[in-house]
Amino acid sequence: MIVDTKYGQYECNDITRKKRRDLYKKVKKIYATEDMEKMHDLADEFAILAFGDEKKANDILGKLTAIEEDEVLLTIINAYMGIETPLDIGG
């Protein structure tokens, strides 16, 4: 899956419908709480899901600032979940 962001395009691993449904439950709960610590943990989980492992995620996202990385990862989460309105988790 290709995800377009204002920082470029990112090729992300595909997931199954079952995996997407399981993650959707988690994403909904975290979005509802607006807990930034949980949101950052979720973003880290999706970075590994999208890119395969921590090293690949670091290679791909390592040149971004923390806020830019948050924006990219939130866009990736929303793309996986089919959510159109992003939630701002930066800064």
Residue ranges and their predicted role:
Residues 14-91:
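Short, surface-exposed, charged amphipathic helix/loop patches that serve as local interaction elements
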